[in-house]
Amino acid sequence: ISFISLISMFGIGLGVAALIVVLSVMNGFQKELRTRILGVASHIQITGINGELANWPLLAEQAMKHPEVRASAPFVQSQGMFSVDGVVKGAMIRGIEPEQEDRVADFRKTIQSGSLDDLKPGSFGIVLGADLARSLRVFTGDKVTLIAPQGTVTPAGVVPRLKSFTVVGIFEVGMYEYDSGLALI
């Protein structure tokens, strides 16, 4: 076997090895990314034309009849801003029912401090993404003010609605979009 043949075989072997390594890394990355995204976002979301679903329990019941649907959970979602000691950050606020949300998302696995169980109706608790909490400089037990864009119309103009919430938990998914821009109430 000539020197050129040896170099050629070595080059082909090195190329195949590099291809195998790259494909393995990409497959692992794809699986990790899918796991993280589907841990906080469902495969399918059903929304109404105007964003509301008046009869969602009936719709959920119909969806559950499909053999490939494993679970469903209702939520409401809106944009808002949080204010703490002059620091203001915008985020997506998602209203959930923790017991039902457990069937479709893995938020409990991502909780760094606090608990989803403290999200109780009327308690005004909130769970923040880790980067959002860091940028607001808050920890579990601190208060944040939610500024909702839907306000009250007065003679002086539209006054936004303000409500104080207690941080009952902080989660970290590992994806900036969720960690810096999502809050659960």
Task: Tell where the protein language model's regions lie, with residue ranges.
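Alpha-helical transmembrane segments
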Residues: 3-5, 17-41
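Alpha-helical transmembrane segments of multi-pass inner-membrane proteins
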Residues: 6, 10-13
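A common structural microfeature
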Residues: 11, 41-43, 69, 90
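Short active-site-proximal "capping" loops at secondary-structure junctions
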Residues: 12, 50-53, 77-80
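Small/polar loops that bind or transfer phosphate-bearing groups
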Residues: 21, 25, 48, 182
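Membrane-interface junction motifs in transport/secretion proteins
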Residues: 30-60
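A structural signal for hydrophobic secondary-structure junctions
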Residues: 57, 61-184
